[in-house]
């Protein structure tokens, strides 16, 4: 992978994907299983302009059939567009980000975005925000652009030595730059990290920016009508075990206490190139040192 200014110029390498910080921070908490298709078709969601129903996805959901997702009633999708690696600090695009934005948009699902940060300075956080704004500029980003940062207490994290105040400054720098670039900023974290300013100075962040809280009740929505997080929040991720038509893997499911009548215009006038899904998104590759011997003679040539 060639790196320019700490930004990886390729979107898919085994080395870089192995250093994906989200890969090591999934499954810390497990939510209740939810069949989203059954939930929405049953008419259990409040029909209100102030409450909307969505999912958040990354390459870990594989190739998504967005027409089926749309038919299930999902109204919005928060799509991971990239991450900064936890060891080398490279910014890397999620290998299915453009495909997911393209297809969700084409099927009438309103889209937002999120970025998985491992920034260690406010300058790096601003760099991440600018990278995100440039990357999504050709798409109709109606929902917020969120900052996601986890695993910072792991000894192998490049953020391990940061103080809570430094992490918060870094998050605010990202969110402020996203706002300056014309998008709605939002901060994502788990309930136990935000409550009482436990791991973040939430009281500082919530004064200006939307909060997206992750909190998984044992009995999911709609039986549990709302999160028990008592802080201000605009979006609630209530399980990571959702079942949605068109998605082969469990998916995070969200309730937003806001919606949009229309769809935002893309910031760029350039039409995005049509892309295909990353066929290798769910494949695991291992290094081997084996000798392969052909059973039959094979003639290789470089012309027909």
Report residues per predicted region.
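Functionally critical loop-and-helix segments that line ligand-binding/catalytic clefts
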Residues: 2-61, 204-279
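SH3-family beta-barrel domains
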Residues: 268-299
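Aromatic-lined carbohydrate-recognition surfaces of secreted/lumenal glycan-active proteins
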Residues: 178-196
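Substrate-binding cleft of extracellular glycoside hydrolase catalytic domains
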Residues: 47-175, 179-181
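Distinct, well-ordered alpha-helical segments
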Residues: 125-133, 194-204
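Gram-positive cell-envelope targeting signals
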Residues: 1-2, 178
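Hydrophobic anchor at the start of a short beta-strand
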Residues: 111, 184-186, 211
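Short alpha-helix capping/helix-loop boundary micro-motifs
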Residues: 302-304
């Amino acid at each position: 992978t060639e790196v320019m200014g700490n930004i990886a110029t390729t979107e898919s390498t085994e080395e870089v994907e192995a250093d994906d910080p989200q890969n090591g921070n999934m499954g810390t908490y497990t939510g209740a299983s939810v069949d989203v298709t059954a939930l929405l078709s049953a008419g259990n969601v409040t029909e209100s302009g102030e409450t909307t129903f969505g999912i958040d996805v990354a390459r870990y959901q594989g190739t998504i059939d967005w027409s089926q997702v749309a038919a299930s009633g999902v109204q919005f999708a928060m799509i991971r567009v990239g991450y900064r690696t936890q060891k080398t600090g490279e910014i890397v695009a999620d290998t299915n980000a453009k495909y997911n934005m393209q297809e969700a948009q084409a099927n009438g699902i309103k889209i937002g975005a999120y970025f998985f940060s491992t920034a260690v300075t406010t300058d790096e956080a601003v760099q991440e925000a600018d990278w995100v704004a440039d990357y999504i500029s050709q798409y109709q980003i109606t929902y917020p652009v969120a900052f996601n940062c986890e695993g910072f207490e792991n000894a192998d994290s490049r953020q391990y030595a940061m103080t809570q105040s430094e992490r918060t400054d870094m998050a605010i720098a990202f969110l402020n730059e996203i706002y300056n670039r014309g998008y709605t900023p939002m901060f994502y974290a788990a309930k136990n990290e935000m409550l009482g300013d436990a791991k973040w100075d939430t009281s500082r962040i919530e004064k200006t920016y939307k909060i997206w809280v992750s909190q998984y009740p044992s009995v999911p929505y709609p039986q549990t009508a709302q999160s028990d997080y008592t802080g201000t929040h605009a979006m609630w991720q209530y399980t990571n075990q959702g079942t949605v038509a068109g998605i082969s893997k469990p998916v995070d499911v969200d309730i937003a206490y806001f919606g949009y009548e229309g769809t935002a215009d893309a910031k760029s006038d350039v039409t995005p190139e049509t892309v295909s899904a990353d066929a290798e998104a769910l494949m695991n590759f291992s290094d081997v040192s084996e000798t392969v011997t052909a059973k039959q003679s094979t003639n290789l040539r470089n012309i027909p």
